Amino acid sequence: MRRRARAILATASLLTAGVVAAPAVQARPSGADGEGIVVWNAQVSRAQLPLLLEAGADAQELGAALPAKGSAGVELYLTKSQAAALRGKGVDLTEHKVSAQAANRLKAAGDGVFRPYSGRNGLKQEILDTGRTHPDLAKVESIGKTVNGQDILAVKLTKGATKSRDGSKPATLYLSNQHAREWITPEMTRRLMHYYLDNYGKDPRITKIVDSTELWFVISANPDGYDYTFTPGNRLWRKNLRDNNGDGKITSADGVDPNRNFPYKWGYDDEGSSPDPTSETYRGPSAGSEPETKALDSFEKRVHFNYAINYHSAAELLLYGVGWQVATPTPDDVIYKSLAGTPDKPAIPGYHSEVSSALYTTNGEADGHAANVNGTMMFTPEMSTCTTVSKEDPADEWNPADCPSDFNFPDSEKLIQAEFQKNIPFALSVAETAAHPDRPSSSVGIDAPDFTPDTFATSYTRDDDQEVAVTVRKSVRDKTLNYRINGGRRHTEELEPWQGGKVFGGHDNIRFDQYRAKVEDADAGDRVQVWFTGRTAAGQPTSSTPFTYTVAERPKGDTLVLADEGGTAPAKNAALYTRALADNGKKAAVWDVATQGTPSALGVLSHFRNVLWYTGDAQPSAATMFAVRDFVNEGGKLINTGEQAGGSVDLGDGALSDDFSQYYLGAYNKAGLKSPPAFAGAGRLAGAKASLAAAPGRPLTAAGAYTITSDTLKPDRFPQFASASAGDYPGVRTPFEPAEGSWFAAAEHRDDAYMRLARTVDLTGATAAQKPSLDLQLSYDTEPGYDQVIIEAHTVGQDDWTTLPDLNGGSTTSAPSQCEQGFLLKEHPFLTHYLTPGASACAASGSSGAWNRFTGSSNGWQQVSVDLAAYAGKQVEVAVSYVSDPGTGGLGAFVDDTRLVLGGAASGAEGFETALGPWNVPGPPAGSPGNSADWARSQALFHSSAAVTTRDTVLFGFGLENVPSAVDRKHLVAKALSALHR
């Protein structure tokens, strides 16, 4: 049973004379030396989202805007210095500006709807007037003070509001304006308050809601910040007005995000919130540090709201459930989905209904704290953007191109009222549900069934019981598991609530919860029918739809080999894994994803102490990853191997997530490494050694090379992610450290770049028979198809430019992807020396030369050699060039160990240890944009490891099929098992 702390607070009722004026001594707005928030347009892909989150963008405002493939335009809200830093990481930004003419026209067309909180005719005065003019239905009170001492006002709306005890009726909270710039949200709650008052006694539905429940309205949860957005240059301020450094000024380094400051999961990681005061998602110096946070927390504890809606903008989403961990369903999602709807059937037209963390995460937010600390089920609508609503009437004066930002909802009574009206059905359905909180009044007709079983078709139980799970309405009594084995008599077991796992579970279970019981005495080959029964709160019998599973024949043992080779053909390498386990005295069962599908965490994985999950050529599915995540969460131990291990999975529609790799496997980033010859263990795998080679029919082209999560998220601050390097590829430099020595030449990715590393080679005394060549080591990580490395050459003084192929076969003549669309050649017209656009593709030759390039990932350092015989007797300028398009990119291009070869003898070696030597950086050719960064000497960007260990997992960047020696395979598995069971 959920226990809710009761705070006994003295709360002042406020009428006209009851509000104390805010203190006069406050931090003042920054002057000319301060940086304001500026709107920027960026063309980005989902792969670049982590850079935007690091810069402080809110994932919930961005995620829906990014397509599964390619890139899209988004708005960012950054200072100029923040934008410069982001631009330095390769994101192409352009300041968004609205012409003075358009701004003046819109100002003249505006209806004057939006008003500050304080001051004459402000929202605060309207709130007080509402309490005075509706004494039988409304009561106004302060729930606390802001940083600057303003009252945060709440309106209680119910029959006999001033006489009834707060929280004595089922209560709903309508909350808005946590983020200062989201002006449409106070209009939503303000209008909703008046909608109830105006229709009371006229509309039976409204009258019933007001008579039987309490409706509370906090029209501005951030009055200081909201007022600040009405001052010059501060329209896009998001946070509260905490003066973080105490200098008496408000600059971009001040303020705390009120929706990242709540104690529940506060600072769980640095993706869902930021430790940086300049970030828009700065979480504050400590959990619950802000007075605005304290006010809402104590308010929720005092009133005990059943439901709440926390209005935000601007993204056209309707969010609910877990925010702190990606794609995590909960028992209460049954109700959330019934009320919010689905992506295909949303409760608010035009919005996308989904779990808060469907793609990206937040932590310390109001919703999670409300549910898991204060027992309040809270939704977050992200209301419509300026761009969207400005399109609705082509005949009006509002044009999407004139939007200063998507937060600048048009000052149009017609558009604001339309946005409000489409939100009414959802708002009313939530209030109605408060009266019977576990039986939702869905506005879209979606039921909330009493039972939702966790079904599966195959059980791998052997000599133990099979646990089954079901999500059940908590008010159902006599919750019972029923089952029959092979059609025999009915057996029953009492269902017990699941307490949760090591990381998640046991939360977000206010009205529904997961319950479990065990099926006993089923043997291999048996068919078991399962269903669940109980009695409703009214005493009526209720039951689930039955499901049936078969107990499979499988070897006795505590380890499962999870074969995940990709495709639909049966696994080829599973026997290598079972043999290595057998050599360690362990019998193993096998589950083949290709032929058996996704394994059930309960039906299959739970019956094993260890799972050895190996991957093949294909990226593992999200469904398999989630099953393995459930297994580890419930105490299982995991060994994960293969080239695809420790990378990203596709959550759907091209949305890649590496959260499982980062937070469960300890691999913060992954790169590929081509054909490492050996592995040497370290740390908990110390002493393990293995020679590596290609597997039959499959070369080792991209062995995993990982950075360690604990190197980024330090264990003293993030002990839950403790991880360590457990081995290397000896003698191999990983892709982003020098091939030799301590320095190399690096062209780190920037969008729209044409970076040249050039030198002149004097071949006036050479002959073609001497086979002159330029040799170098090259490592690159580019957006496949779209960005490239080319080696350009021309005779000094002539315009006979061409690109040179790699004599070692590393280059290709394929034209850039979508070259025919023209955007790449428009950005870099010099490329027409080598490319000719066509109707469906570009030809690999141009006005003076041929096209040869490197694209994608080199998976480590490659030896490259280009033939210079055509320039014998001349001087030739050669350039290693990194050329990128306007969209996303990889890490860039890297060069080391350059040398000239003439007659088989190398000379003029340059490894960039002290200088660029004969090389120079001439900048982009005429017609290309200027580079925001260029080639430069660099030390290692980072070191990557071949294996990683955590408390519960061991990760290898290669598979046992890449280990020719059975003895080595045995020892690797032995070390991994020992590391997991110390």
Regions found by a protein language model. Name each.
Residues 295, 416-435, 552-558, 671, ...:
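Extracellular ligand-binding/catalytic regions of CAZymes and related secreted enzymes
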Residues 230-241, 245-247, 251-447:
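Metallocarboxypeptidase
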Residues 1-27:
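Secretory targeting and sorting signals
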Residues 533-610, 614, 643, 664, ...:
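Aromatic-Pro/Gly-enriched surface loop or interdomain linker
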Residues 786-788, 859, 884-902, 966-970:
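Extracellular carbohydrate recognition
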Residues 770-781, 789, 793, 875-884, ...:
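Extracellular beta-strand-rich recognition modules
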Residues 687-755, 784, 802-862, 910-944:
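Extracellular glycan-recognition surfaces and repeat-rich motifs
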Residues 613, 618-708:
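A glycine-rich, often tryptophan-bearing local segment used as a flexible ligand/cofactor-contacting loop or short
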